[in-house]
């Protein structure tokens, strides 16, 4: 594994040093997320879509590369944990691991993840297998969090919102950087990127390498003597490249490829000698942008997403000391997701915009471990929206759209949304969005055929939701701060779960079950500049998420609070970022018992940066995550006693106090 680390390190170094050096300073004034209206994006129709949605009444948060670097975040999960209001995201056992997610009271499976507009969600399974455990933070230009029902433009699973991870962008001037560092969990990190003109176009290339021995994932007294894998280690590597050619001011072609691979331990408290997944992932895209006139622009994009993993688990045999039970030996599971997206924007008259689009997705996957048969599914979708601009209605923007989804397996889904934004003047505004969204059944729910467990159902209906998001905001008098009060409401029906039991085969069978998931909540946030040298943000979110009047749904926090401050004196060669993350009551019911609250904790992080030279090409970053070494659980699971076989509660631990240091050379 060390040889892989050094090979990726060499690749990163080549990317960063191989281009001619020139001055390029790293932005430092950014400590967290910001509203998308404040972000200037120079691109074509797809890249500008979040900005257009924000003007129509959709709430969009943005996390920038500067905020990620200043916070010393290692992966995508860490980058979002402390920065985005209303977003709960908890890795199982530290960086590059599975995560539980809740956006404004949602379930994990209600959030759609994309990279450069390509869907990442693992449609083998609905929840718990988020597609984030091999994605490093260093490759990010920005992360866009689009809240509310986003099925109109983004399709399945965007019930509570969509998160688009934008990788390093193009530049007209050659620049880049190389970073190396480590932390007190015996971790090593190296990343680099270079970008600029090349031949007739522009290029971007980036690479990242992370390796760690990790930390103890459970309390020591919750391990069984039979388990000898006591630290959860990982190694994760990424290589990516983009190339763009502008054939004319009206025609642009962009191609990209990213390869992620790694070895990720899977922590288990009993029996395990070693358990891990070997990940491999490729995301290949090609996109053509055409600006035909001032009243018509469009894009066509093809993508191929290949995700494969091999799971290995060797267990100790308590009945034969020194003996090994082979549970899984490089057993494959994975999927291929490929398709075409096309969208056009028309301006038929002043003050009116029309969007028309088509999506095609072909998906197939299989799992040898949990026995999901290999099947293929295709989905065709048509969508359209009409919106106004303030040129037509002063200070008011309205939008309405509809989407029709036709999968080859399962039943069709039609959804629609309406939204509005009114600017009162003086920076005060009112936003509202209402609509519905859907989640298509997963491969497990459609095609599973495990003779000892479960069976899928090809006749499932999609889960469907009704949503309402409303917010009111404005400036704080006398300072450069802005506040926003948000209400969110969501009902989800046609729930997919085990519905019947087949006594002949002994299998649970999936079906659409009665009941409704109801989410009701509110959020208040404030952000901006306290002084020219101090910026910050703070937020509080309350979520009630229940099913049919029952208790709070497991793994969805009742309350969240986040705060951050960034000190960036422009005349001094340093900066400091501090953040607070509070998770309120959050429940789980492991080991066959009743609900257990494993929340109510606060984690503090602090980081500092020192610029060595006047041009700010060289910087040293130090950080302290979990400053007070708070011992907290990110999830609860079930273990089994070696002697009796009885189940017991296991606490998955969050990252302990960790000191990090990095050096960056920019050019």
Regions flagged by a language model, labelled:
Residues 38-71, 100:
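N-terminal periplasmic "start-of-domain" segments of outer-membrane beta-barrel proteins
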Residues 52, 77-119, 141:
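Extracytoplasmic beta-strand/coil segments of soluble accessory domains associated
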Residues 100-102, 119-147:
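Short acidic/polar hinge/loop motifs at secondary-structure boundaries
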Residues 134-177:
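A beta-strand signature from Gram-negative outer-membrane beta-barrel systems
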Residues 164, 171-173, 181, 193-279:
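Periplasmic-side early beta-strands and strand-to-turn transitions of outer-membrane beta-barrels
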Residues 195-198, 206, 245-246, 432-433, ...:
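Conserved C-terminal beta-signal and adjacent last beta-strands/turns
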Residues 272-291, 333-335, 429, 436-492, ...:
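Outer-membrane beta-barrel signature, preferentially recognizing the C-terminal barrel domain
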Residues 354-355, 391-398, 489-491, 511-590, ...:
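Gram-negative outer-membrane beta-barrel transporters
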């Amino acid at each position: 594994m060390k040889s892989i680390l050094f090979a990726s390190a060499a690749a990163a170094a080549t990317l960063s040093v191989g281009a001619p050096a020139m001055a390029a300073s790293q932005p430092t004034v950014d400590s967290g997320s910001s509203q998308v209206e404040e972000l200037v994006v120079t691109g074509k129709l797809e890249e500008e879509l979040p900005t257009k949605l924000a003007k129509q009444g959709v709430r969009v948060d943005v996390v920038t590369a500067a905020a990620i670097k200043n916070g010393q975040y290692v992966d995508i999960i860490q980058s979002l944990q402390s920065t985005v209001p209303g977003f709960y995201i908890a890795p199982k056992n530290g960086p590059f691991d599975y995560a539980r997610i809740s956006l404004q009271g949602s379930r994990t499976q209600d959030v759609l993840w994309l990279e450069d507009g390509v869907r990442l969600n693992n449609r083998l399974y609905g929840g718990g297998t988020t597609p984030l455990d091999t994605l490093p933070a260093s490759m990010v230009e920005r992360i866009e969090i689009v809240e509310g029902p986003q099925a109109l433009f983004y399709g399945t699973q965007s019930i509570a919102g969509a998160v688009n991870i934008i990788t390093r962008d193009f530049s007209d001037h050659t620049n880049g950087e190389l970073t190396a560092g480590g932390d007190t969990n015996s971790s090593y990190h190296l990343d680099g990127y270079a970008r600029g003109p090349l031949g007739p176009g522009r290029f971007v290339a980036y690479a990242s390498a992370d390796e760690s021995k990790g930390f103890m994932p459970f309390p020591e007294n919750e391990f069984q003597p039979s388990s000898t894998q006591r630290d959860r280690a990982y190694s994760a590597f990424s290589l990516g490249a983009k190339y763009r050619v502008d054939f004319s001011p009206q025609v642009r072609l962009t191609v990209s490829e990213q390869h992620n691979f790694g070895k990720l331990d899977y922590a288990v408290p009993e029996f395990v000698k070693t358990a891990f997944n070997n990940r491999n992932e490729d995301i290949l895209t090609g996109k053509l942008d055409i600006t035909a006139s001032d009243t018509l622009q469009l894009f066509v994009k093809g993508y191929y997403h290949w995700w494969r993993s091999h799971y290995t688990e060797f267990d100790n045999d308590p009945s034969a000391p020194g003996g090994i039970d082979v549970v899984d030996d490089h057993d494959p599971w994975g999927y291929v997701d490929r398709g075409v997206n096309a969208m056009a924007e028309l301006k038929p008259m002043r003050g009116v915009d029309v969007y028309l689009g088509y999506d095609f997705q072909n998906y197939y996957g299989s799992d040898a471990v949990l026995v999901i048969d290999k099947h293929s599914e295709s989905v065709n979708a048509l969508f359209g929206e009409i919106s106004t601009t303030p040129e037509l209605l002063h200070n008011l923007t309205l939008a309405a759209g509809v989407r029709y989804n036709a999968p080859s397996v399962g039943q069709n889904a039609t959804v629609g949304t309406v939204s509005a934004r009114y600017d009162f003047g003086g920076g005060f505004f009112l936003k509202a969005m209402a609509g519905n969204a859907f989640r298509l059944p997963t491969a497990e729910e459609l095609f599973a055929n495990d003779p000892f467990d479960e069976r899928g159902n090809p006749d499932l209906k999609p889960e469907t939701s009704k949503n309402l998001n409303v917010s009111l905001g404005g400036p704080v008098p006398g300072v450069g701060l802005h506040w926003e009060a948000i209400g969110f409401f969501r009902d989800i029906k046609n729930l997919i779960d085990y519905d019947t039991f087949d006594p002949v085969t002994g299998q649970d069978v999936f079906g659409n079950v009665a009941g409704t998931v109801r989410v009701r909540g509110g959020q208040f946030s404030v952000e901006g500049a306290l002084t020219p040298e101090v910026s910050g943000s703070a937020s509080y979110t309350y979520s009630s998420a229940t099913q049919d009047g029952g208790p709070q749904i497991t793994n969805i926090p009742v309350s969240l609070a986040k705060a951050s401050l960034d000190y960036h004196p422009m005349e001094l060669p340093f900066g400091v970022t501090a953040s607070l993350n509070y998770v309120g009551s959050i429940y789980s019911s492991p080991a066959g018992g009743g609900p257990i609250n494993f929340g109510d904790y606060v984690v503090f992080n602090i980081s500092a940066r020192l610029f060595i030279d006047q041009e700010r090409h060289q910087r040293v970053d130090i950080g302290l995550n979990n400053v007070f070494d708070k011992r907290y659980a990110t999830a609860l699971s079930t273990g089994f006693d070696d002697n009796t076989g009885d189940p017991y509660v296991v606490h998955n631990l969050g990252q302990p106090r960790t000191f990090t240091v990095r050096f960056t050379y920019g050019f």
